[in-house]
């Protein structure tokens, strides 16, 4: 999880953050989410320095995709087992990211008005963010779905030899890259796994 501690600052605006979404947000932003992911990238000496430092910026679909996948992974791993409120928060988070897909597409491809986006259940400040960052809002779910697709592909290809831990290590060791490169890395992961069979 890195050699240095991370700092997570929780927003105290009660109107902005609902209590039931806290655990999901923590998993997204800390462990197994962004903090864990970025700590791996920064400390991975096999990556070129410019990729460790994020010189070319944060590639949203892979980065935010991992964050949303971390929320999913927490639910899948039973981390909400005794916390129905937390599970509700995770489901709300998934649904919110799905609405983002619709609203961003509506604004940029279907010529929606600002009010149509707000009427779809997205706050005005969020809508303004989507207007100036086309494609960023849907990148969370696009990235998560791609990671799940690649995981399923590797699992089917490798069968009993598939290791979820090794798959996660491959993603984290690859770093923050475009999804096409992550797919190529997954194909290489499968090829290496088949040679072991």
Which residue stretches match the model-derived regions?
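N-terminal maturation segment of proteins
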Residues: 1-197
